[in-house]
Regions:
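Alpha-helical membrane insertion/targeting regions
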Residues: 2-188
Length: 188
């Protein structure tokens, strides 16, 4: 069964949204809890320090590609091209998924990168980082719920929630790149 067949079967299935959204919230909560544990409790091994220096750049690239795919998807839906819209958003989801895996690997093996700047630039960086983190926590269940409504053919609900999901997901993707740029600009 390919992706198109899976999507078609989901559109035809009568799946009640309430339990699925409950599962989405639980899965999102578990994912966020794991990431918080990874960032604040887990200590990276010194054996791997420095070996994963390419991952932040890869993560920024994936965030940038996600933002681009989101914008292309918006263009397509505004021009009533549902198939291209769907392909663009599935691509954005794939970029975000690969980003999440790469982010977990980087933090599990190499730990955090501390911002070395001081003064107003540090305040600006921390403000952007805080908004990025908070909205990424909000974005996860929203993205999954938006996809659920689309994949099950509930397009009215999909459109309603997508109006909120899109700007949050786009902001998280763009600020992911901005955080990387700040860290690189002040690393030297």
């Amino acid at each position: 069964m390919n992706v198109c067949d899976l999507i078609a079967s989901m559109e035809q299935a009568e799946i009640s949204p309430r339990p699925v959204i409950g599962v989405i919230i639980v899965v999102s909560g578990v994912a966020v809890s794991f990431l918080l544990w990874l960032l604040y409790v887990h200590h990276a091994s010194a054996d791997f320090a420095g070996r994963w220096m390419f991952l932040p750049a890869l993560n920024a690239l994936l965030n940038g590609l996600c933002a681009l795919a989101l914008c292309v998807g918006l263009y397509f839906i505004e021009h009533h091209n549902r198939e291209a819209h769907r392909a663009s958003l599935l691509l954005a989801f794939a970029f975000s998924s690969v980003f999440l895996i790469s982010y977990i690997v980087k933090h599990a093996l190499d730990g955090d990168t501390i911002f070395p700047g001081h003064g107003p630039v540090r305040t600006l960086y921390l403000s952007i980082l805080a908004s990025h983190v908070i909205l990424s926590i909000v974005a996860l269940p929203m993205v999954l719920t938006t996809f659920f409504f689309s994949l099950t053919g509930r397009f009215a609900m999909h459109r309603r929630i997508a109006r909120l999901t899109f700007p949050i997901w786009l902001y998280v993707s763009i600020t992911g790149v901005v955080v990387f740029v700040f860290l690189r600009a002040y690393a030297y």
